[in-house]
Structures are given as C-alpha cells and as structure tokens.
Regions:
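Short, well-ordered alpha-helix to beta-strand connector turns
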Residues: 1, 31, 54-55
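Asp-based phosphoryl-transfer active-site loop
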Residues: 1-17
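Structural motif
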Residues: 3, 85-87
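Short, acidic loop-to-helix structural element flanking the phosphoryl-transfer center
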Residues: 12-35, 69-73
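Conserved phosphate-coupling serine/threonine residues in phosphotransfer and NTP-handling enzymes
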Residues: 38-40
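Substrate-recognition "cap/lid" segment bordering the active-site pocket of phosphatases
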Residues: 42-85
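Acidic, divalent-metal-coordinating active-site segment for phosphoryl/phosphodiester hydrolysis
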Residues: 90-95
Length: 95
C-alpha cells in the first residue's frame, strides 16, 4: 500500500494553521499512511500549526528547499521509502 505524501501549507493547512476540512476528509477515506511535507523552520512550524497535525510531519527547515530533489531523497531515506512506494498530493487553489 502506497504512502500518501501531502503538501502542508496551502494544501492541507492554511497559512494560519486551519486544516482544510475537505482535504482531511478525503485523506481519511484511505487507509494508507499519510505524511505531511513542509520546508517550515521552527518558527513557521508553530505559526502554521504543524505541531497539531493528525499525521506525521516531515521538514528539513529550508535546508534544502522542497524545490530541490535532494529534499525528497532525504525524506525517502528517513522513512525507508522509494519513489515507487508513494503518491504525492500537491494542491493549487484559486483565491
């Protein structure tokens, strides 16, 4: 069963720390393990409420940024996963 990777801010949670109910409800329909991905540093982690998430949160504190492929290599290593064992949910909202 694949692990679901979910982008944190503006996908699973707002920049004020509010969990997007629709996304949470959707994810709860799957039995898969879920991991929230972010680049947040310690200050941002608290600001975005990432310390209160219902799933494990992974961050490298902007070192490197998520735009750098080494972020994902380190995340895979941390969780003992490969690219074939995950599905990545990144969201784009029209404001």
């Amino acid at each position: 069963m694949k692990t679901i990777l979910v982008d944190a801010v503006d996908c699973f949670v707002s920049d004020t720390g509010e969990i997007y109910k629709e996304m949470h409800d959707l994810l709860e329909t799957y039995q898969n393990k879920k991991i929230i991905l972010t680049g947040a540093n310690d200050e941002q982690f608290k600001k975005f409420g990432l310390d209160k998430m219902p799933y494990e949160v992974f961050t490298l504190k902007h070192n490197p940024e998520k735009t750098d492929s080494s972020y994902y290599e380190k995340m895979f290593e941390n969780f003992g996963l490969t690219k074939d064992e995950v599905i990545y949910a990144d969201c784009f909202f029209s404001l």
